[in-house]
């Protein structure tokens, strides 16, 4: 019985409770002190001696808890460097070499290490950029930017954060929209601070009665006083002329502007009122306001020339006035000995810099894209900037001063499309800027562009029997035409197509004049295609101008009339390359332009004067060419693949540059082109006068009378197509 009880006690005896150990196996074996370090994952002794520690597995939960509790604080650079950085540096060799720490610990430490490396790399990049800026090395800065972007991309690919690490961010979430609007206008740039100090040391405030009197003699103050006096004497005239300008030119100027002004507006904005008035004086025929214009011009000239000294104090209306001075003539051609001709490109550049100085477009961009605020004042400032940008591009291209366009400025130009109150005119401005930017880009690298264009043209037309019928196709312009097709279909005035035709003809003419000896001299087919394309778009430009409503033409900017004259001049310079029928078309169309400008009230205008001289040059040039060769000999390819040009054709094409002098209205200037005509013929051409349009009821009567008064030898050049066969 006793034995049974003892067996039962043996079976029911509880197992001995295992004593909790706080030391690792190595420390227990050598009976040494064991201090466990959770962030390291080992005890102090094993860590120093680089031994495997049993506590790494036994206290896994404690290790993870310690890492997680310190993760948030370790993201701060100061705490990371001062506290946990040594621990991490000591832990990494163990993790890498011994592979003892389990996967969750390794992932956490790896994540934190990636964040640390990314932060340090960004800091190094910024320090390097600062050093490069101090050294002034542009190439190094460019390389550094590329290096920074590549490092940023690598950091993004290497960073593999767990879901538990979302709280480890620095709290700055940069979205794409934030990066798009992170530009600012500095509130305290260095030169502004220096200028403020200068104003404090040398105040502009008048201290004495003598200073007050001297201040009233400042040029801009005198100009304001004198124009206000002029306005008081001619108040109704100024108001009426300002209304005429705003009504007639509203299609070309800032969209959505005012149509009428009053005395209150005039007193606040004297400069722009004077510009309205003097431009409108040029719209009327027969020098109706010649006396008033002579009195007003010195006042406007003083306003305009003193804007440089008023740069910091210019208002948005002042800059708008400078815009109109660059778009329209404020001086009269007949008074050029006294009234200056201002450089429109210089005025545009100054106005663009001025508006960027007084308006914070970065704030406008932020309000539009982030806050979705669409104020009327912001739209007004953006419209001024867009009109200035379009005008500057037109004059840059027209004068051959091609410059790289600022990407930031392009972003500002596109902001008007975001406004719900934007209208059709705003879309036209954006389209004009886009077209000008495309053409400007072509001319910036014109030599390389032409070589690539010629190579593609020959590759596409090789083996085609009808190469002579092809017109050149400039893909960049065709892309623009397709991209803005919907807007062009709604453009009743055809203004955009007018600019499109001008740029097409300008590029083709530049091909012929700049690269004739390199390319066209040995490829007659290529030359004829370029010539045909140039003629096609010159004709399209002139036909489009004839279709414009008179109300648009009367208020058109000078650049538009310059484009018109350029088309006539181009046809004149290359007239000897056309056949008889084409010559007659050129003469007929240019004469119709002259008639149209006169009948819509543009008498005594610079465009009518130039077109009239060009028509006279057309006649004189054609007459001499007929006397030299009897008819124009069109060269042929002697053998496929090896085109050759006759000496007469080569000489006639090269002579087109000599005819540039004809645009000055002097037919004798073209006599250097092997002219065999008599002196009497030249004198007759020089003394030729265009008939008075007012004497005729229709263009047909005007042209017939004009044609009947030509010499018989000149008539025979344009009469019939059969003359070409003689």
Swiss-Prot record:
> Tell me, what is one Gene Ontology molecular-function annotation carried by this entry?
zinc ion binding
Report the superkingdom from the record: Eukaryota
Location in the cell reads: Nucleus
Q: What Gene Ontology terms for biological process does this UniProt record contain?
A: nitrogen catabolite activation of transcription from RNA polymerase II promoter; nucleotide metabolic process
Q: Which InterPro entries match?
A: Carb_Metab_Trans_Reg, Zn2-C6_fun-type_DNA-bd_sf, Zn2Cys6_DnaBD
Q: Where is there biased composition of kind Polar residues? A: 640-679
Fetch the SUPFAM superfamilies from UniProt: Zn2/Cys6 DNA-binding domain
Indicate whether Zinc appears among the record's keywords. Answer: yes
Segments carrying the region annotation (Disordered) are: 152-183, 629-681
Q: Specify the DNA-binding region ranges.
A: 24-53
Provide the disulphide bond pattern. Answer: none
Q: Which residues form the signal peptide?
A: none
Q: Which GO terms describe its cellular component?
A: nucleus
Would the keyword Metal-binding be found if you checked this record's keyword annotation? yes
List, alphabetically, the PROSITE patterns matched: ZN2_CY6_FUNGAL_1
- Keywords, in A-Z order: Activator, DNA-binding, Metal-binding, Nucleotide metabolism, Nucleus, Transcription, Transcription regulation, Zinc
Acidic residues biased stretches = 161-170
Q: Report the family membership.
A: Belongs to the URC2 family.
Q: What does this protein do?
A: Probable transcriptional activator involved in uracil catabolism.
Please identify the protein, giving its name as recorded.
Answer: Uracil catabolism protein 2
User: Taxonomy-wise, where does this protein's organism fall, top ranks first?
Assistant: Eukaryota, Fungi, Dikarya, Ascomycota, Saccharomycotina
- Primary gene name: URC2
């Amino acid at each position: 019985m006793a034995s049974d009880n003892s067996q039962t006690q043996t079976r029911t005896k509880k197992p001995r409770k295992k004593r909790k150990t706080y030391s690792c196996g190595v420390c227990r074996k050598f009976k040494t002190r064991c201090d466990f370090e959770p962030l390291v994952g080992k005890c102090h002794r094993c860590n120093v001696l680089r031994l495997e520690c049993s506590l790494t597995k036994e206290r896994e939960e404690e290790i993870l808890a310690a890492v997680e509790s310190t993760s948030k604080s370790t993201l701060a650079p100061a705490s990371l460097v001062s506290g946990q950085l040594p621990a991490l540096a000591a832990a990494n060799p163990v993790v890498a070499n011994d592979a003892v720490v389990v996967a969750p610990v390794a992932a956490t430490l790896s994540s934190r290490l990636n964040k640390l490396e990314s932060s340090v790399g960004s800091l190094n990049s910024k320090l390097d950029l600062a050093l490069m800026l101090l050294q002034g090395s542009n190439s190094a800065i460019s390389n550094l930017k590329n290096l920074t972007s590549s490092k940023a991309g690598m950091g993004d690919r290497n960073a593999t954060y767990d879901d538990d690490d979302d709280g480890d961010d620095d709290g700055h979430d940069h979205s794409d929209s934030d990066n798009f609007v992170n530009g600012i206008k500095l509130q305290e740039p260095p030169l502004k601070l220096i200028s403020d100090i200068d104003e404090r040391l040398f105040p502009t405030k008048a201290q004495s009665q003598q200073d007050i009197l001297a201040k009233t003699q400042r040029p801009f103050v005198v100009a304001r006083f004198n124009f206000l006096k002029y306005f008081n004497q001619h108040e109704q005239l100024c108001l009426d002329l300002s209304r005429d300008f705003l009504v007639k030119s509203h299609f070309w100027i800032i969209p959505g502007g005012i149509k009428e002004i009053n005395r209150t507006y005039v007193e606040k904005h004297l400069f722009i009122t004077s510009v309205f008035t003097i431009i409108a004086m040029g719209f009327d025929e027969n020098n109706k306001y010649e006396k008033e214009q002579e009195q007003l011009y010195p006042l406007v000239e003083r306003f305009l020339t003193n804007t440089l000294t008023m740069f910091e104090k210019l208002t948005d209306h002042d800059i708008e006035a400078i815009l109109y001075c660059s778009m329209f003539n404020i001086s009269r051609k007949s008074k050029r000995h006294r009234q200056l001709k201002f450089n429109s490109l210089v005025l545009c550049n100054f106005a663009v810099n001025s508006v960027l100085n007084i308006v914070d477009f970065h704030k406008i961009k932020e309000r539009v894209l982030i806050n979705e605020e669409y104020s009327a004042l912001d739209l007004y400032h953006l419209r001024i900037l867009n009109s200035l940008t379009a005008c500057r591009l037109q004059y840059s291209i027209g004068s051959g001063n091609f410059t790289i366009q600022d990407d930031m400025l392009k972003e500002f130009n596109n902001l008007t499309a975001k406004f719900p109150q934007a209208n059709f005119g705003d879309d036209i401005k954006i389209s004009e800027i886009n077209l000008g930017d495309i053409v400007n880009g072509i001319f910036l690298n014109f030599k390389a562009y032409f070589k690539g264009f010629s190579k593609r043209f020959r590759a596409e037309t090789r083996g085609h029997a009808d190469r002579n019928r092809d017109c050149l196709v400039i893909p960049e312009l065709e892309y623009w035409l397709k991209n803005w097709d919907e807007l062009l279909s709604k453009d009743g005035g055809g203004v955009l197509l007018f600019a499109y035709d001008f740029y097409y003809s300008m590029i083709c003419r530049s091909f012929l004049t700049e690269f004739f000896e390199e390319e066209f001299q040995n490829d007659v087919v290529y030359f004829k295609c370029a010539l045909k394309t140039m003629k096609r778009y010159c004709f399209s430009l002139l036909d489009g101008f004839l279709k414009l409503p008179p109300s648009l033409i009367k208020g058109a900017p000078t650049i538009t009339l310059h484009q018109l004259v350029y088309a006539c001049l181009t046809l004149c310079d290359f007239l000897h390359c056309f056949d008889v029928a084409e010559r007659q078309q050129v003469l007929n169309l240019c004469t119709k332009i002259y008639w149209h400008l006169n009948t819509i009230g543009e008498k005594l205008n610079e465009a009518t004067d130039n077109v009239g001289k060009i028509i006279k040059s057309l006649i004189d040039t054609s007459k001499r060419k007929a006397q030299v060769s009897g008819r124009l000999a069109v060269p042929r390819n002697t053998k496929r693949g090896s085109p050759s040009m006759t000496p007469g054709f080569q000489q006639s094409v090269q002579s087109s540059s000599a005819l540039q002098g004809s645009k000055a209205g002097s037919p004798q200037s073209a006599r250097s082109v092997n002219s065999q005509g008599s002196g009497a013929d030249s004198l007759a051409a020089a003394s030729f006068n265009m008939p008075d349009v007012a004497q005729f009821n229709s263009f047909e009567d005007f042209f017939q009378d004009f044609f009947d008064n030509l010499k018989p030898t000149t008539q025979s050049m344009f009469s019939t197509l059969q003359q070409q066969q003689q």
